[in-house]
Amino acid sequence: MTLPRPLRAAAVVILLSFNAVGAPSVARAADLTVTAYGGAWEQAYRKCFVQPFEKQTGKTVDVILGSPMQWINQVGANPAHPPIDVMVGLVDSGEIARERGLVDKISDAEIPNLKQLKPNMLGYGKGYGFPIAFGDFGLMYSKKAVPNPPQTWKEFVDGTVAGKWHAGLPGISYVATAQGVIGLFATVYGGSLDNVQPGLDQVKRMKASGNVSFYSEPNSPLISLRSGDIDIAMYFDGRAWAEHDANNPDIGYLNPRPGAVAFPTMVQKVKNGSPLGYQFMNVLASAEGQSCFANLLQYSASNRDVKYSDQVRSRIAKDDDSLWLSFDVVSKKTPEWVEMWNKQIGR
């Protein structure tokens, strides 16, 4: 029996979600415990940061997968003896961790390579972390299935509703949904971060059309695009290009007008975590480590001395071309947005 496209996509999401983040171990067997996103991101993180740190120090590192709020809640459940030493996340989730008193203040005394970071990037951490890199959340598509991809976000929404393609959208549990979908569409459709209903209305339109599958983890859109279960998806630029180069040359990527939302990846030292976390963060801030990471994942690095290949330089997100939503507002509004999404969309 062949399942309908939405059910096949859902089956993939359930399986991969369980494998990737269903039961992360937080046992403190290693000298340092750090977090990472899954898929190609984890592989690059290990190669460019974890392995060099282990080689330099002789210490061992556990890498656990999951999502920022999951890690924040784990640390918050036992702040005196946290199960994590260094957390990655978004700027808005980093602000939540800072406000809850779960992370340490940092300086170039503990992390000398902070001096190499771009001031605008360093500023997002407010002294309690820094971005490793940032990417845009635009559209990944099959060049065969979508030979004329939408050039604006409104064309994407209208084309999905009209059935020009079957689209993949992130569900509410995905890391990019709050600002990359809700905040984006609210802005595009005449609302604001204080009034996101116009954006949610567009997600409801697409869902009602039957031409959307929702995903909750980063690998499922890649698999669904390759299998033909979806034709186009809202997705991160670097991950899309990495998949194009490694497995699927049919993939195309673009940032529809008026732009795609920028997502810096924040890193923070957990309060009461191992002091080795500072040494690890110094590797994360290094030009060598970020050059490796940025070229593998094709993200724009925070270290000003990073060297890109010519191909990667032409693809990475540019500060002036991205949409930068207010992270402070997003962090405060996200619980309200999640409740609205759950009531109106439910996935």
Q: Which residues does each predicted region cover?
A:
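Extracytoplasmic ligand-binding site segments that recognize negatively charged/polar headgroups
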Residues: G39-Q43, P83-I84, G89-R226
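Paired acidic/hydrophobic, glycine-rich loop segments that form the ligand-binding mouth/hinge
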Residues: P82-V88, F214, D231-F236, G252
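A bilobed periplasmic-binding-protein/Venus flytrap-type ligand-binding module shared by bacterial periplasmic
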Residues: G138-A145, L184-V188, F263-L276, V283-L284, ...
